[in-house]
Amino acid sequence: MVYGKLSTRGSEEVFEWNHSYSKIYQPKVKYNPKGVFMYFENYNVEVRDRVKCISAIEVGVPVSTQWDASGYFYPIQIAQFGLSHFSKNLTDAPPRLVILEDGFNYLADWVSAEKSHFKRRKDGSYRVLEFSVKDRRMPGVVTRVDKLHPSLLILQCALRMVGNGSLVIAVEDKDRGFTYSLIYTCSQELLTVNGNDVIYGIGDCPDQWHYLTRDLAIDLLKGHVVSGRGKKISRTRLRLLSLTLKGEGQITNLTLRSSAHESQFRSAAEWLVKHQDVVTGGWPIPVRRRFGPGIQELNPGWISAMGQGQAMSLLVRAYNRTGDEAYLRAALNAVKPFQVASAEGGVLARFMNMYIWYEEYPTTPPSFVLNGFIYSLIGLYDLLTVADQFQSVRRIFDAGMASLKKLLPLYDTGSGSTYDLRHVMLGSAPNIARWDYHSTHVNQLLLLSTIDKDPILKTTAQRWMNYMKGKKAPHN
């Protein structure tokens, strides 16, 4: 099978073809842990089918349905969410934004119905809009936003509810021909749909401030998926109509933006700090993982070297960005599982009892997944750039790089690469990496070749790129 597209070269129209559907990103400069992470500025974690929604309860991070349809917090997915938004924050244009209400300088045009009222006042260090709508059947306190630029689909605010209040955004979906209500309310229910109402719980509301950053297009999309209305949405076909306050509470710093990458990457970094097991240094994965015949399944609570590595990459960037030592402490603590055998709850394995390996899946017998191992090495390298005085981190990184260089040939099929080494460990057929994983291998090796000049990294990457063009290793 070949893949391709029509393009123009000079005055001629040509068909550019490839044996692969994946893209290679040639690094132009040496990899920098203060900059974009690989090519993650092109990632959009939120739209993935395996993301149930972005939690409004747990500081705005994705909830995964991979391996468990009920949904759970998957550290790898959360780290990738943070890394993608960190990278977009560096590459995207500055956002459009409109401050609607801050209680002082920016005052929205609110309208209150019968038995509803609002007023502005100072509350501690905040200037706030205080509202009271005691009869929830009434329209509430409303402001229109239908004249604003259509790209302003990110909502941010500080919201404090007294009792069971809610913030309601009316959104017109022109493709479906309906208006939907996005409702953020005091509840522990993650996401529910009732007709055209898409309801997100923001947790219990014991008269405390909630700081929301919500991508309204994504929130509506996930509601459509739950209700069976389809898995696609066009941001350009959405129009915000109004914002409504119900119940009793206060709101301030109410803003609509075209993007909020800084807040989103920080949400992921803060989640990692908050949910790290301080004893083990890991982010336990709370689901059972079945890996395949001949390999024992992983029980809930396993730790992934890939998760540890990508978390370190995000935490180092958050530390570089903010100077907050909490991020650095968490990144350093994340090294602990690299020193504990995978059979004992860590991620450390050995190939043929000789070569160190850090397991994406700490299976018995070891599985030696390539892409997850390399992501762990990138995370260790990132950490070394801010903590090179820690010799244990240096030893762990150097041992991993030495193993990678020795074992890379075992992943080469002559026409592609393998995902892992089960063909060696089990004597089974090789687990051939599909093209998107193969291209990930290539992109990872190209990145490493900018920080380590050993020719095996660059030459292997080049050979594996040629496989994507249909070239194969010669036969005898």
Model regions: which residues?
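Long, well-ordered core segments of solenoidal/helical folds
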Residues: 3-13, 18-68, 164, 172-175, ...
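Extracellular carbohydrate-recognition regions
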Residues: 7, 19-21, 94-115, 257-259
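Carbohydrate-binding/catalytic loop surfaces
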Residues: 44-69, 281-302, 348-371, 413-440
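Well-ordered alpha-helical segments within folded domains of soluble proteins
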Residues: 74-89, 302-319, 367-384, 433-449
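Structural helix-adjacent loops and short alpha-helical linkers that scaffold large soluble proteins
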Residues: 88-98, 222-224, 257-267, 318-333, ...
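Short carbohydrate-recognition loop motifs
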Residues: 111-141, 185-187, 192
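Extracellular ligand-binding interfaces
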Residues: 132-138, 148-222, 248-250
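Exposed low-complexity, polar/acidic, P/S/T/G-rich flexible segments that act as propeptides
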Residues: 238-263, 285
